[in-house]
UniProtKB/Swiss-Prot annotation:
Binding residues for substrate: 204
Identification of the protein by name: Probable 4-aminobutyrate aminotransferase, mitochondrial
Subunit structure: Homodimer.
PANTHER family assigned: 4-AMINOBUTYRATE AMINOTRANSFERASE, MITOCHONDRIAL (PTHR43206:SF1), AMINOTRANSFERASE (PTHR43206)
Catalytic activity entry: 4-aminobutanoate + 2-oxoglutarate = succinate semialdehyde + L-glutamate; (S)-3-amino-2-methylpropanoate + 2-oxoglutarate = 2-methyl-3-oxopropanoate + L-glutamate
């Protein structure tokens, strides 16, 4: 073990004593391997008290700014991964740094409210400015949560509560329901299920793993509910050259949804909710068409099933809209839309018909984080003030064009270029080649990441401009040539 003074010295070297960065570097700057010696030393220390198996490198957050992340060894990388798609305005945006120094945020940090019982006096105003102002069409009610997984988990609980109330003619639980549930018996503990999709990712809690099918390592050794998993479209690209094939994908997947609803009903295990991502991000950036989602909405309406759209990774503007489902033109809005990541706090919007009447059924100590809500309020203001959604559309259109050109010149190393806005991906022939590319790109100063079995994904922030795009593709081209 390092002596206490030596450990403090190492951390002090990394953190430095300078103020928070307030400008981007002129470009990437790499002086060591990544992870470098300081990152490796910090990881060794961390490993003595905490798991480190997923740690890539330690970050100097004081020196990181805008679209650039700086690691413990001083390497500056252009970041198109942005904390797994969770930084709306990049690193240390001045407007957010200013909010972080305000008394109302400090008091929420020091005396963290248990929001379900003791909310701040200005909590409703914060909800209105940060969340209601960007609410999905047709949904105004919102419930904050800690993260995307807890948002999805509690959205499903809400769906179950509503579904059972409908069975009781709109009434709450009676004495028999309350007594039997304590022994996990009917009618208080019903047989109900939630439908997910092949390739989906909705979180790693016990409940959400039952609707997650992206990577085996997430699920192995963990008990799961007997819930249906339906097929999700697997399109061929370019879309305009594969219309018939992709249309058949939609039809086959919708037929599978109908078949599994019927099958689980025969098992006395009704499908109470269907949860779906607009883009299966963790699973490999798989897309569904508006026609597919329209069909899915019509099926849920026909069967009285709650339709939950998981926008944890897609929400926040990277697709060119705050909500990726905005362009679906549904016959009626989703019943619920979950969010987190770029929207800084977790939670879900829901239709008024789903409001839970009884206290403590949707509840935990924190029920979200008011400090994140305060930051989101300012982030939304900046997004509107600076026209960042419009910028995302413009830069995103160019990004899609350039990604297609990169694929065409790759000599077969890339295929299936796809995306919406700056939310984009491209495939490699194998996962091992993709992983080799990611490591080489990082050594060249571009921080990117993988998803699915063999996909490379791009998740830049909303302050990502044409200048950053040009540099991104210079680095991608350099990396591809060195592969």
């Amino acid at each position: 073990m390092l002596p206490r003074l030596a450990k403090s010295s190492l951390i002090q070297q990394v953190r430095g004593v300078s103020a928070i960065a307030n400008a981007e570097p002129s470009g990437p700057s790499i002086s060591t391997s990544i992870p470098g010696p300081k990152s490796k030393a910090l990881k060794q220390e961390m490993d003595k008290v905490h798991q480190t198996t997923s740690v890539r490198f330690h970050v100097d957050y004081e020196k990181s700014f805008g679209n650039y992340v700086v690691d413990a060894d001083g390497n500056a990388l252009l970041d198109v991964y942005t904390q797994i798609s969770s930084l709306p305005l990049g690193y240390n945006h001045p407007d957010l740094v200013k909010v972080a120094s305000q008394p109302h945020l400090i008091t929420s940090l020091v005396s963290r409210p248990a929001l379900g019982s003791f909310p701040r006096t200005d909590f409703a105003d914060g909800i209105s400015h940060a969340l209601t102002s960007i609410a999905p069409k047709g949904l105004k009610a919102v419930q904050t949560m800690l993260c995307g997984t807890s948002a999805n988990e509690n959205a499903i609980k809400t769906a179950f509560i509503w579904y059972q109330a409908q069975r009781r003619g709109g009434l709450g639980p009676d004495a028999l329901h309350l007594e039997s549930c304590m022994n996990q018996q009917k009618p208080g503990t019903p047989n109900l299920s939630v439908m997910g999709f092949e390739g989906a990712f909705h979180g790693r809690s016990l409940c959400m793993l039952s609707v997650t099918r992206s990577k085996p390592i997430h699920k192995v050794d963990i008990p799961a509910f007997d819930w249906p998993i339906a097929k999700f479209p697997r399109y061929k690209y370019p879309l305009d050259q594969n219309v018939a094939y992709n249309k058949k994908q939609d039809q086959e997947c919708l037929a599978d949804v109908e078949a599994k609803i019927s099958e689980w009903k025969r098992r006395d295990n009704d499908v109470a909710a269907i949860i779906v991502e607009p883009i299966q991000a963790e699973g490999g950036d798989h897309y569904g068409s508006p026609a597919f989602f329209q069909g899915l909405r019509d099926i849920t309406s026909k069967h009285g099933i709650v339709f939950i759209v998981d926008e944890v990774q897609t929400g926040g503007g990277a697709t060119g809209d705050i909500w990726a489902h905005d362009h679906w033109n549904l016959s009626s809005p989703p019943d619920m839309v979950t969010f987190s990541k770029k929207l800084l706090t977790g939670g879900y919007f829901y239709g008024e018909h789903l409001r839970v009447k009884e206290a403590y059924r949707i509840y935990n100590t924190w029920m979200g984080d008011p400090t994140k809500l305060l930051l989101l309020e300012k982030a939304v203001e900046v997004i509107k003030r600076d026209g960042l959604i419009e910028q995302s559309r413009e830069v995103g259109a160019e990004f899609q064009k350039r990604l297609g050109e990169l694929q065409a010149s790759s000599g077969g190393k890339l295929d299936q270029a796809r995306g919406r806005g700056t939310f984009a991906a491209v495939d490699f022939p194998s996962g091992s080649l993709r992983d080799k590319f990611v490591d080489l790109a990082i050594s060249n100063g571009l921080h990117c990441g993988g998803c699915g079995d063999r996909s490379l994904r791009f998740r830049p922030s909303l302050v990502y401009t044409k200048k950053h795009l040009d540099l991104t593709f210079d680095l991608l081209d350099k990396t591809l040539k060195g592969l």
